[in-house]
Amino acid sequence: MAIAYNLGKGEYKNWIISETEFNENNLPKFETIFSLGNGYMGLRAATEEHYFNETRGCYVAGMFDRFKGEVAELPNIPDYVGMEIKLDGERFNLNQGKIISYHRYLNVKDGELVREVEWQSPAGNITKLVFKRFVSLANLHLAGFKIKIIPVNYSGKVAIKTGYNGQVTNSGVQHFVEGDKRVLPDGKSYLTVRTQESGIFTIVAGKFRFLINASEINPQQQIVTGRRQLFLRSEYELKENECLEMEKCVIVYTGRDLEFKDKDIDSGDIVETALTTLDKAGTKRYEELFSEHRQKWHKLWHEIDIEIGGPDFDQLAVRFAQYHLVQMTPSHDSRISVAAKGLSGEGYKGHVFWDTEIFILPFFIYTFPQIARKLLEYRYHTLDGARKKARENGYKGAMYPWESADTGEETTPEFGEVDIKTGKPIRIWCGEIEQHITADVAYAIWHYYQVTGDKEFMYNYGTEIFMETARFWASRLEYNQGLDRYEIKDVIGPDEYSEHVNNNAYTNYMVKWHLEKAIDIYNWLSDDSRDILEKIINKIALKEDELNEWKKKKDKIYLPFQEDSKVIPQFDGFMDQDVIDISSYRGDVGAIMKAYSWDEITSSQVIKQADVVMLLYLLGEDFSHEVKEKNYHYYEPKTLHDSSLSPSIHAIMGKEIGDLDEAYRYFNKSTTIDLGRNMRSCDAGLHSASLGGIWQAVVLGFGGVKVKDNVLNIDPMLPEKWDYLNFKLKWQGMPIRVEIRNDRVSVSFLNDDKAMLKDVSVMVKGRNLQLNNNKAVVNL
């Protein structure tokens, strides 16, 4: 097979994902899973040489542009990776000649992508080539590249053409207009462009270094230009077994970067900043720049690495998930958040969904709470967009968009795929009626506060969001006079195969929770810091009558539940719909649409992803074990898992009901969504939520971590194939290590500074322990 998981050796065992053979058809898969990033920019792993099936991509977080008649998307900035290599007159292309050996691998411990090739050209010339690259954690604006070329059985001329290509597009859409091109006397060069609609200035600058047999040379370079293109071409005479090295240091800046926020700058200032940064970095060799980057990664891994005593693939898969969660997240800037595909591809146009708050955020809450806070601050910075959406739809308060970009306004496209039977494009209703995201944001805020105790966040951001979103729900509820209850009609729940439904259980239960928690927060703040509360009340003009309205309405919200069967109907009428045998459609996303029309699917008990099961996970303390078990077994056979968000939730709930085989089966399913052997699984980018779900399945699922009555609970159950599970987390700001064995659980502080520690109450397997400078051990 083209992918291997076991080629990491020694200290790199279970840290390496390998591509072991070249196949142009597989390029999109590896471009995605081998993508590099640092939260500021993400780089798809397109090869240096060009192929027909490639999708080259470099994306800067928070940078959006809108083409006429379309929604805003993350534009593909000028490509700085591509190059043309000619070896004794023959173009280096792996579709020609013969591949003697090939190995490309991503090292997630170091954050480096390496490709080693031995290639025989059609003329019989054999060349060894090594390509290395990284996107720096030490300098968010920097990417580094190194290439080695060794002619094995010939002497001849080697030519390299590389530079910057601004003709790249987003699936054909060109977002940039021409700027400047410069080649400077000191070896620096750059290309500038500007987005067409949003007007964001962008510079890609670089400096190249060439060596033959480790001695630096200054080759004559030919300048090649085109529209939005600047390349430098150079030639070298190499003897047999001589080694040519090229190092490239690239710097990227844009006009929306945090460094320039609220500053009176022009494009010249941005160019100067980029060139100054390049001057400092350009004096360093690849190894030095990479070493600085690698040290940052190793420091991160010291804080977050999870150790699994089980199958090697499980260990690798969790590290793969954590690596990508870190590299795709804009931890430097609270004005932006994590896109559904991270920074690894054009899928979903770089938009932010509920994926961030419900699936990705928990990883950061428990490992890097300062980053989690910034992701939540994004929702505060875009609160005006949510207020605007509420007004435009006739509601009060703040109604978060289903898909969000930089402003917080709704960016969901109106139409999607074509219906196989009608031939008409399917209307996408999510932007109008998939409204549970507003409760999801509130849930994430409360989850963050429970784990961190960050009052300052609640004072300045969280409470205002909670009150404004509670306002929305109070205005959204519809009173059913005949049944004396409040309902929520015409919505989409998490299951997007059921549209225009009434009283989606997930939505209704979450709204009741939302209103209750808003009242609790109001009362808490009234006691804790009345002056802060008064400031918020005055800012948003919150009246006491509104609070009384919330209290009245929350107690009358209809919560679907069948007392006899203990099943929660997913929505009104769901239990009366036809049941389709979906077994033959599982495992092939969208396959059911080739056999049934959209209307047939939406009117049957066919579920795209966890819906009621999702509810049981998030509000688990509100439901008995019996209710969880009966609903899991009712809904699981009806769920296609056509969304990558679904398997990890079923893994967690499988463990919750005590079915470890089921839990482990779904954990395996979640780990193979991106990393598995399906070569078509992630062409458009990574499944960010799924990666967050993998971490949750391990730590919050098998590790049993949850917050109950404001106390950290640890109630683990390990899969049969695991002997141990070790992980670290932060609770109320204190680093804690958890070690789980089949016969015991130990919990200890990681900080040796006793002055920084405080007594912590931890519930382990139902036993209340005091953690105060000592390791607490519970025998099972």
Swiss-Prot record:
Pfam families: Glyco_hydro_65C, Glyco_hydro_65m, Glyco_hydro_65N. The keyword Glycosyltransferase applies. Substrate binds at residues 354-355, 608-609. It catalyses: kojibiose + phosphate = beta-D-glucose 1-phosphate + D-glucose. One of its GO terms (biological process) is carbohydrate metabolic process. Its EC number is 2.4.1.230. Catalyzes the reversible phosphorolysis of kojibiose into beta-D-glucose 1-phosphate (Glc1P) and D-glucose. In the reverse direction, uses Glc1P as acceptor to produce alpha-1,2-glucans up to a degree of polymerization of 6. This is Kojibiose phosphorylase. It comes from Halothermothrix orenii (strain H 168 / OCM 544 / DSM 9562).
